[in-house]
């Protein structure tokens, strides 16, 4: 990797053996006793990063479709261009993502166009779980992130809606590869 950084995994009560794999990998991890939702896991990571004075957080959905080797592609705009928020997109370089299920090929661009229109911003893949942002963005936010109703899937739309609404936040999309299992 081009940059020095720490990798922390959030184990939210997984039962698929991944927690044992992480424990034996030598990587840092935060183990939650039970799964309280994806939002809770992200909030836990953000709070941990702020408490430990990290500057950037990069999240990758734990669905095994994104390549961690692309972390530099997602983080580079923050470090080199002073961007605040970077969103991965499987549609910027679609040729490398040609195995994306047809339903997603049709529905995600439609949803992304609606979001782009509503928030007067350009985004091509609002559902991609590969993102990075400056923690300063969270620290200076005019919205609360530690609310119980955000512990499930509500956190990501809530957080990103606030990011998209803030015209002072410098945003950028970068291409990422998504790998779906072949049927």
Where are these regions (language model features)?
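Short beta-strand/loop segment that forms part of the nucleotide-sugar
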Residues: 1-14
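Conserved donor nucleotide-binding strand/loop of the catalytic core
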Residues: 5-8, 19-52
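Residues at the starts of beta-strands that form the adenosine-phosphate
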Residues: 6-7, 56, 170
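A short, conserved beta-strand element in the Rossmann-like catalytic core
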Residues: 13, 37, 65
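Residue-level signature of catalytic and energy-coupling elements of molecular machines
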Residues: 45, 63, 134, 163, ...
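Catalytic donor-sugar/metal-binding loop of nucleotide-sugar-dependent glycosyltransferases
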Residues: 149, 160-177
């Amino acid at each position: 990797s081009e940059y020095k950084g720490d990798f922390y995994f959030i184990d939210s009560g997984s039962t698929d053996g991944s927690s044992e794999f992480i424990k034996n990998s030598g990587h840092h991890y935060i183990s939650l006793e039970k799964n309280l939702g994806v939002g809770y896991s992200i909030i836990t990571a953000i709070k941990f990063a702020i408490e430990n004075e990290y500057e950037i957080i990069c999240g990758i959905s734990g669905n095994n479709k994104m390549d961690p080797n692309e972390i530099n592609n997602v983080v580079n705009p923050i470090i080199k261009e002073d961007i605040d928020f970077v969103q991965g997109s499987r549609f910027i370089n679609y040729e490398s993502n040609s195995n994306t299920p047809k339903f997603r090929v049709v529905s995600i661009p439609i949803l992304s166009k609606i979001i782009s229109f509503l928030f007067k911003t350009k985004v091509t893949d609002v559902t991609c779980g590969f993102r990075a942002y400056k923690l300063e963005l969270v620290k200076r936010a005019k919205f609360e992130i530690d609310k119980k109703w955000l512990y499930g899937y509500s956190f990501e739309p809530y957080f990103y809606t606030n990011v998209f609404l803030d015209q002072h936040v410098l945003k950028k999309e970068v291409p990422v590869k998504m790998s779906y299992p072949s049927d």
